[in-house]
Amino acid sequence: MMRSYEELLERAFEKLADKDVVRRERFEIPRVSIQREGARTILKNFSQIAKTLNRSEDHLYKYIVKSLGTAGFIDNGRLVLQGKFTESELQKEVDDYVRLYVLCRECNSPDTEFIKEERVLMLRCLACGAKHPVRNI
């Protein structure tokens, strides 16, 4: 028995409505979590962020410190920065880092790695194979 397109579509939506579907991105960066101690700002989940991005803590540390124009150090998975910074300022730096050093410029995939070709640091996408030069920190 032939059914109309509308009937089939309605039936499909009824079946979908029974399922509790939650759409999540495969790549979710943890929001920055800070703590202030006097004139210092501590990024408490620094190690977790670096691990999620699949980048070394040292590389992310150098980018944040240079971008903010401050001094800092890594202490037990936390980033301690000289100066008072807001969560939004630090989140902006992490988002900029992801845009420049993590996401593929061709397919937007986070599955990338650093390689060196003739003394030039390159970002190679493991999904599409594209390679792009990135600026040294």
Swiss-Prot record:
Whether Protein biosynthesis counts among this entry's keywords is: yes
Gene field: eif2b
Q: Which UniProt keywords apply?
A: Initiation factor, Protein biosynthesis
Subunit field text: Heterotrimer composed of an alpha, a beta and a gamma chain.
Q: Using the chain's own numbering, where are the disulfide bonds?
A: none
Recorded hits in PANTHER family, A to Z, give: EUKARYOTIC TRANSLATION INITIATION FACTOR, EUKARYOTIC TRANSLATION INITIATION FACTOR 2 SUBUNIT 2
Identify the Pfam families for this entry: eIF-5_eIF-2B
Family in the record? Belongs to the eIF-2-beta/eIF-5 family.
* A single MF term (Gene Ontology): translation initiation factor activity
Role, per record: eIF-2 functions in the early steps of protein synthesis by forming a ternary complex with GTP and initiator tRNA.
Please spell out the taxonomic lineage of the organism that makes this protein.
Archaea, Methanobacteriati, Methanobacteriota, Archaeoglobi, Archaeoglobales
User: Do the record's keywords include Protein biosynthesis?
Assistant: yes
Top-level taxon of the source organism? Archaea
Q: Which organism is it from?
A: Archaeoglobus fulgidus (strain ATCC 49558 / DSM 4304 / JCM 9628 / NBRC 100126 / VC-16)
Q: What is this protein called?
A: Translation initiation factor 2 subunit beta
